[in-house]
Amino acid sequence: MTYFVLFLGLCFVLGGLAVASNPSPYYGVVGLVLASVAGCGWFLSLGASFVSLVLFMVYLGGMLVVFVYSVSLAADPFPEAWGDWQVIGYGMGFAMVLVVGVVIGGFVESWNFGVVTVDSVGMFSVRLDFSGVAMFYSWGAGMFLVAGWGLLLTLFVVLELVRGLSRGAIRAV
């Protein structure tokens, strides 16, 4: 199980690296899917099944819509590939930043802050993950309505921007 969690962490970091150094929006979608699946699997291995499911639905349901619009607006006739020297340079630069972060993180880890889990303690306790469901729908109902209206307004704004003056989709020239 430890190796699987380490593998998910490595996939999450590589997915974030792929999103940050993508040569075109087509490859950014692949990196986002890899990072979201690995991150949600990581949460699932920690026992946060509801949070993992909600984040998976948000990332793959909402963020991929943003990438679809960005791909349609920035469609290149000759997109760059992963093997181009500029993309490899970006990847190496981000990898160096990650290595420096791991070195600094090893220094900070020596301070020993402890490990935080999502399970409650006791025989008749409700898991903190599932008690969050009740808080989402009781205290956060107004915020859900405001966020829903904001997303609907954003959808209409993006549709108007894509439509343009010619009453059709924007095409690459």
Swiss-Prot record:
GO terms for cellular component: mitochondrial membrane. Its main location: mitochondrion. It is an enzyme of class 7 (translocase). Pfam families: Oxidored_q3. GO terms for molecular function: NADH dehydrogenase (ubiquinone) activity. Keywords: Electron transport, Membrane, Mitochondrion, NAD, Respiratory chain, Translocase, Transmembrane, Transmembrane helix, Transport, Ubiquinone. Belongs to the complex I subunit 6 family. This is NADH-ubiquinone oxidoreductase chain 6.
